[in-house]
Amino acid sequence: MHKDTMQKSGFSARGGWWVAVQFPLLLLAYLIPGWSGQDIGGDLFIVLRVVSQVLIGIGALLTLGGVVALGRWLTPFPQPLPESKLRTGGAYALVRHPLYTGILIMALGWSLMTHSLAGLVFDVMLFVFFDRKAAREEVWLAEKFPEYKAYSKRVKKIVPWVY
C-alpha cells in the first residue's frame, strides 16, 4: 500500500485534473445534443420521448442513490477522503461507480430526447472519460480498502452485470 499517495492533499495529487476536465465535459453533454438535435415525427418521436424520459429518471435515481450512500464522504475528486468508508450497499451493490453510471444514463437519455447523433457520439467519449477516471480512482480505493479487490470481482464497474 502506498501510504504516501493517500496522504497527499494538493489539487493534482487528489486527481484534480480529472475534476477540471469533468465539469466542461458535463456541460458539453448538455449543450451538444441541444445544438445538433434533429426534428423527427410520428411514432418514433413518441418512443424516443418515453425511452429518454425513463433513462433520465433511472440515471437520476442511480446518481441520487450514490450521493445518499456516500453522504458526507462525497467528493468530485477520484481520491477518497481520508476518513471515508467503503460503500458496497444500495446503489454500490449494482455498480462500483453509480454516480458515473447515472450521469452516463442521463446523458444518453438527453441525447435520445433531442434526437442528436452528435450527442450519442459525445456520450461514448464521456463513457471513456469516466472509465479512465474510475480506473484511477480504483487504484486509490484498492490502496485504502483491502476488501476493495473482492468487491470489484463481485460488482461490475459501470454497466450493471456487463462491465
Predicted regions and their residues:
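Solvent-exposed interhelical
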Residues: 84-94, 100
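Membrane-anchoring alpha-helices and their flanking helix-loop junctions
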Residues: 1-88, 105-163
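Hydrophobic alpha-helical membrane segments
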Residues: 98-106
